[in-house]
């Protein structure tokens, strides 16, 4: 069985990590390259960098930063944010990113998924899906929508979670798998930022319906939350941001605890 992965997420705006940082010993607090190097030394399996200024403000993605990161760290890293074309993705991969993640562009131009996968390989493509639960009957419901307890379904959102779509989580996930994505990063908008745990049932169902890895995002507040989504939720990886950035949980301690509870992680 493949080892479960622990993935810190770094939101970058104007070249700086924007969520609060509380580490000692870093030469440049908030610098994405320094942060990446720190997490690599701590034992992170991968990193995700999201240029949060890109999608909303139409900024070009941070190619120069990607090159600096690739020169400095020795673990895989994924880059996303504002990738709206094959050319955007190619520029980042050629600059040294191990994978790219696309969200809004995948919804409006799904052929991008197949084009990147055909050129570089499926393993280079991660489709990010942001979704929220919506009460049935309150919006125009997708035909394929599957209700939760008979009264709600998971509605896919775009543009940083600001715009609703006519897509439903599980059917969209299967569609992007068929288009060639190698991995899915699903963020529950209901759970994101709450620190009350992940949407475990949703991840468990995704594990049933997909043959590609799923990264869990949104809701990590404790070691127990991460353990639950990796075991009960059967996610292949757990992504978190603030609990790592604020030093609430250290990656070495997290991995030791997971290993002691029988979860297969790399130490």
Task: Briefly describe each language-model feature range.
Residues 5-9, 46, 74-78, 99-101, ...:
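Structural preference for beta-strand elements that scaffold enzyme active sites
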Residues 11, 39, 47, 79, ...:
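Conserved, mostly hydrophobic/aromatic
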Residues 12-14, 18, 98-186, 190-191:
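Conserved anion-binding
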Residues 28-40, 84-90, 165-175, 226:
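Short, acidic/polar
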Residues 46-64, 104, 185-196:
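Glycine-rich, proline-tolerant flexible connector loops at the mouths of alpha/beta enzymes
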Residues 58-80, 115-130, 195-216, 220-221, ...:
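Alpha-helix-loop-beta-strand connector modules within alpha/beta enzyme cores
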Residues 77-78, 83-96, 100, 201-238:
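Catalytic cores of alpha/beta
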Residues 113-120, 230-240, 244-267:
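C-terminal helical cap(s) of enzyme catalytic domains, especially alpha/beta-barrels
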């Amino acid at each position: 069985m493949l080892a479960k992965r622990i993935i810190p997420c770094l939101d970058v705006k104007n070249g700086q990590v924007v969520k609060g940082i509380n580490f000692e010993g870093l030469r440049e607090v908030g610098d994405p390259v320094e942060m990446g190097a720190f997490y690599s030394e701590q034992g992170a399996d991968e990193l995700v960098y999201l240029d949060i200024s890109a999608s909303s403000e139409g900024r070009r993605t941070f190619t120069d930063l990607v090159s600096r990161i690739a020169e400095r760290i020795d673990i895989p890293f994924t880059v996303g944010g504002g990738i709206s074309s094959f050319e955007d993705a190619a520029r980042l991969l050629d600059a040294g990113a191990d994978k790219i993640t696309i969200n809004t562009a995948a919804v409006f131009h799904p052929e991008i998924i197949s084009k990147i996968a055909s050129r570089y390989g499926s393993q280079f493509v991660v489709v990010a899906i942001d979704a929220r639960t919506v009460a049935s009957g309150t919006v125009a419901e997708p035909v394929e929508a599957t209700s939760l307890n008979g009264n709600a379904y998971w509605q896919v959102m775009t543009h940083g979670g600001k715009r609703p779509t006519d897509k439903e989580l599980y059917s969209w996930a299967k569609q992007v798998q068929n288009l060639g994505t190698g991995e899915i990063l699903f963020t529950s908008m209901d759970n994101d930022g709450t620190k009350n745990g992940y949407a475990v049932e949703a991840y468990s169902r995704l594990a049933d319906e997909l043959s590609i890895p799923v990264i869990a995002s949104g809701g990590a507040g404790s070691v127990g939350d991460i353990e639950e989504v990796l075991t009960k939720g059967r996610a292949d990886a757990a992504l978190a941001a603030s609990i790592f950035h604020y030093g609430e949980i250290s990656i070495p301690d997290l991995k030791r605890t997971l290993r002691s509870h029988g979860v297969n992680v790399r130490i």
